[in-house]
A protein has these predicted regions:
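Catalytic histidine-centered segment of alpha/beta-hydrolase-like enzymes
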Residues: 288-298
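Conserved acidic catalytic loop of the alpha/beta-hydrolase fold
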Residues: 100-119
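Conserved HGGG/HGGXW glycine-rich cap/lid loop of the alpha/beta-hydrolase fold
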Residues: 32-89
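Conserved hydrolase catalytic core segment
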Residues: 118-159
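A short loop-to-beta-strand scaffold at the N-terminal edge of the catalytic core in hydrolase folds
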Residues: 23-33
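Conserved alpha/beta-hydrolase catalytic His-Asp/Glu region
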Residues: 176-230
Length: 311
């Protein structure tokens, strides 16, 4: 884990943006690091059942690196996708889909641009967050994505991984302590790669909410599992074909971080991503599956260098 993890630091700022949905509106939370007046914004978006605080170490490191390199200040924004973390839940479970998520992020970008004109926009997306990034990178945004980081995700998601998601997504559990919750999460997250107990506890503490009786549960709407369980192989294949069309429209420099042991993203898919669309650069993380947590210094440095935030 990065040495920055040991430095005392203030918590990031928490804010909200109102986003439309089929039943009205909902509030989406986002965490901000760095200078709110910065014109260079890096958006980091998490995986399916995670939340924005997954990027604490990466965000702190990127902000510090820009300062150390005497580069213009940056702002790192890490949203909680609707239904996760501090964001509100949707009334209709079937509204948890990528069109909704991408629309929410477009609203967020519009809000950030109104606060301070964005001149440079970069995107770091883990798994689901990477798919959202691909959808936006293929669109003519007011400020186009300058550089796109896809963390162990592409147009192809293996059917075995989808079956695995069907088994656990939506099971928020009930735990008597943070340690109990962390232990349970580790059982389904070992593919994230080696972490010390301290590192894993740090990643877990923002993943739980307190119930009325004092017990803990995972901090997301169990209903996000409903559309996951509704996915058939035919729907998955159609989604894959559509995402390849999206990927082929991406023109910005793209970095694919690939967990060498990933069950979700195959080597053949990685090779196709190197040949199609933006012809992604690939950084392979040995000993890690789906997905690298971007909390260890070697992983952080890959992102830092691709975004040009190193001395």
């Amino acid at each position: 884990m990065s040495e920055l993890a040991l430095d005392p630091v203030l918590d990031p700022a928490l804010d909200f943006v109102s986003c439309p949905d089929p039943n009205g509106t909902h509030r989406m939370a986002y965490w901000s690091w760095g200078e709110s007046s910065a014109s260079h914004v890096v958006v980091c978006v998490h995986g399916l059942t995670r939340q924005g605080r997954d990027f604490d170490l990466l965000a702190r490191s990127l902000v510090a690196s820009a300062k150390k390199a005497n580069l213009p200040a940056i702002r790192v924004v890490c949203p909680d996708v609707v239904g996760r973390g501090q964001s509100e839940w949707l009334k209709d479970p079937m509204a948890y889909h990528f069109a909704q998520y991408a629309g929410d992020m477009a609203v967020l970008l519009q809000s950030l641009h109104a606060q301070q004109a964005i001149e440079r926009l970069d995107w770091v997306g883990t798994s689901m967050g990477g798919v959202i990034g691909m959808l936006l990178a293929a669109q003519p945004l007011p400020t186009p994505i300058r550089r796109l980081v896809l963390n162990d995700i592409g147009p192809v998601v293996s059917w075995a991984s989808i079956l695995n998601m069907k088994n656990y997504v939506g099971k928020v559990g009930r735990f008597q302590s943070l340690q109990d919750a962390a232990n349970a999460m580790w059982e389904i997250s070992k593919s994230f790669g080696p972490h010390t107990s301290e590192e894993w506890l740090a990643l877990s503490k923002h993943m739980v909410r307190t119930l009325e009786d004092g017990a803990l549960a995972l901090h997301y709407d169990p209903a996000i599992g409903v559309p996951v369980r509704a996915v058939t192989q035919e729907k998955a294949q159609a989604g894959e074909a559509a995402l390849w069309q999206v990927y082929d429209l991406i023109a910005c420099p793209t970095l694919l971080i690939h967990g060498a042991l990933s069950e979700l993203l195959s080597l053949s898919a990685v090779q196709d991503m190197q040949q199609r669309g933006p012809r992604a650069q690939v950084a392979t993380i040995q000993g890690v599956g789906h997905a690298p947590t971007l909390t260890h210094e070697d992983q952080i440095d890959i992102v830092r260098r691709f975004l040009g935030l190193h001395a």
